[in-house]
Amino acid sequence: MKANKLTAIAMLLAALFFATPKAKAQVNAQVLYDFGSDREFVTLTLEMFKQDKWGNTYFFVDHDFNYDQHVKGSPNLAPGGTYFEIARCLNFWQNSSIKNLSLHVEYNGGITRSYPINNAWLVGVDYFIHSKDFKNTLNLKALYKNIQEKDSDVPMQLTAVWAMNDLFGVKGLKFDGFADFWWETHGVDFREDGTCDTKKTVFITEPQLWYNVGQHFGCYNLSLGGEVELSNNFGSTGGFKCRPCLGVKWDF
């Protein structure tokens, strides 16, 4: 029975995420070095967004090249952690008065050399706001969130996603990012005796700023820039953290 249930869920998700009319996808790869005092490693991100007649699909995969931080004395011979998100906005009423409102389905999960990042399932609504020329966009989401084997006082996540193209009238300057706030009872600041502090909420935002330098020499795929991760009680770190990153982005 359990196997049949998992198969049914997998088939439903496949239908939601992949059985959609063909459309051009926006795909990019980012290589960022994290200067955070507790990080100091490289992350490779593969990101995709695809719009279609039924809504849109978004996913990203992060590979953290920090194996040596998980296994002391080991060379940095492999990613120390991988994290994956995939989300589908369903909208069958794009020609109606509520065209900016979509249903949202999402999965998050990952693994590190030291600990798992538990499966999370999210469902809710997304509201889309944009400028007339679509250069500036904002998505606001209210989502029910279930994290496997985790407790929360309020099983919800609130999300904002934004993009601003040609910022300040500068061609090729892009400011984008996201902000997430959710409830999750979790341990932070673990001590040698195994004890830790307990927190109830998590906040993280990662604003990015990119400049398309490639436009000046005929290579429009190449951008330079970075991001700043601002978080509170994120992962196993308690309190507020600011972690700046610099890197390159290639749009396929």
Where are these regions (language model features)?
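Cleavable N-terminal export/targeting peptides
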Residues: 1-26
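Short loop/turn motifs that connect adjacent beta-strands in outer-membrane beta-barrel proteins
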Residues: 23-26, 54-56, 91-102, 130-138, ...
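Transmembrane beta-strands of outer-membrane beta-barrel pores
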Residues: 31-37, 63-67, 105-113, 129, ...
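Outer-membrane beta-barrel translocator domains and adjoining extracellular loop/strand segments
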Residues: 70-75, 114-118, 151-153, 187-195, ...
